[in-house]
A protein has these predicted regions:
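Minor-groove-contacting beta-hairpin "wing" of winged helix-turn-helix DNA-binding domains
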Residues: 341-345
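C-terminal scaffold of the Radical SAM
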Residues: 2, 23-45, 52-316
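Short amphipathic alpha-helical interaction segments
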Residues: 316-328
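A short, conserved structural fragment
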Residues: 331-340
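Immediate flanking context of iron-sulfur cluster ligation sites
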Residues: 1-9
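Local cysteine-cluster metal-coordination motifs and their immediate loop/turn environment
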Residues: 10-21
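Short, amphipathic alpha-helical interaction segments positioned at domain boundaries
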Residues: 347-360
């Protein structure tokens, strides 16, 4: 069984207007004390032997605010398995060729850039601190540093969005050498700046769905195969870490607001950086990973839900009513079903929540 290790780096120079993820001010980068706290927790979960994770994901926040030396300390302490995928999320304005070379030497072999848009006016609206020029420079620097596994994030259905904006952003990322692209529909979260003050020019739900289907089609045309609702990859470059999540595998998350699922049990750290630093933030148990979780997560994937595996793992079978609903989904173009595997089409992924409401 694969093990994924997530290390949360909560520090950010500034908060993006759409973001409601837990973060902490980081004008001076990532404190050494915080890295020491992560190392403390690593030792706590592996007191006798290293974890040897199959994937490590340095997420945030802004993990590229780490020094390469501190990234090396964390990776060395985790003692990843041979061939492990080791990802670092990065904001384009925070990296140089020198720091990227340092991360590469530290053991990072996959870099993920938060691009979002190729239009500077849109980036300003989103509260992103980089420019399109800096994004292009970051991709070029990553290639020179030796990275061959590069991901880029695109946001869809932004204020005053057009297909032309998507095309420009895809061109920037594809020409930058990306082997993987994550494309997310903007969601207005209540606790974000956009939630408190919604921007003008937001697309309607139907328009957002059209942008999503347009993105799927054009990403496929450029060689990025959809393997999950929001993720697309060149062959062999699917994100291995997130696949552990979607396959309900074991993963350990360390840091404030980080979540874990180990041996079928979920737990998380409180969203309190100060408490984490001072060793006063014990993990909180959060129930188990059950059949419903598995069904929900498997139907995010284009490969779909294998009913035999579902039964073998949880002793669950679809009822006559559920199978009848599945057949209606197939007729409507929302799903494919060959009697053994149920998979949602791109049109079905848009209305996944409604489909799940009938299946759960």
């Amino acid at each position: 069984m694969s093990l994924g290790l997530y290390l949360h780096i909560p520090y950010c120079f500034s908060k993006c207007r759409y973001c409601d993820f837990y973060s902490a001010p980081g004008q001076r980068g990532v404190p050494t004390q915080y890295v020491d706290a992560l190392l403390r927790e690593l030792a706590r979960f592996a007191p006798e032997a290293p974890l040897h994770p199959d994937t490590i994901y340095l997420g945030g926040g802004t993990p590229s605010l780490l020094s390469p030396a501190d990234a090396a300390r964390l990776i060395a302490a985790a003692a990843p398995a041979p061939g492990a995928e080791i990802t670092l999320e990065a904001n384009p304005e925070t990296v140089t060729e020198q720091t990227l070379c340092g991360f590469r030497e530290a053991g990072v072999n996959r870099i993920s850039f938060g691009v979002q848009s190729a239009r500077d006016s849109q980036l300003k609206t989103l509260g992103r601190p980089h420019t399109a020029r800096q994004a292009r420079a970051a991709f070029a620097a990553a290639r020179r540093a030796g990275f061959t596994n590069i991901s880029g994030d695109i946001m869809l259905a932004l204020p005053h969005y057009t297909q032309a904006e998507f095309d420009e952003t895809l061109e920037l990322i594809a020409e930058g050498g990306a082997t993987h692209i994550s494309a997310y529909l903007l969601k207005i979260e209540p606790d974000s700046a956009f939630g408190r003050h919604p921007p003008e020019g937001l697309p309607s739900p139907d328009e957002a769905a059209d942008f999503y289907l347009y993105a799927v089609e054009h990403l496929e045309h450029h060689g990025y195969r959809q393997y999950e609702i929001s993720n697309f990859a060149k062959p062999g470059y699917e994100g291995r870490h997130n696949l552990i999540y979607w396959d309900c595998g074991d993963y350990l998350g360390l840091g404030p607001a980080a979540h874990s699922c180990m041996g079928g049990r979920r737990f998380y750290y409180p969203s309190d950086t100060e408490a984490f630093l001072n060793d006063k933030a014990a993990p909180v148990m959060d129930g188990g990973c059950g059949a419903e979780d598995y069904l929900i997560l498997q139907l995010r994937l284009r490969k779909g839900l294998d009913l035999a595996a579902y039964k073998a793992r949880y002793g669950k079978e679809f009822s006559t009513a559920q199978l009848a609903f599945v057949k209606n989904c197939v007729k409507s173009g929302y799903a494919t079903f060959d009697g053994s595997t149920l998979a949602l089409t791109p049109a079905g992924l848009i209305v996944q929540n409604s489909i799940l409401a009938e299946l759960l």
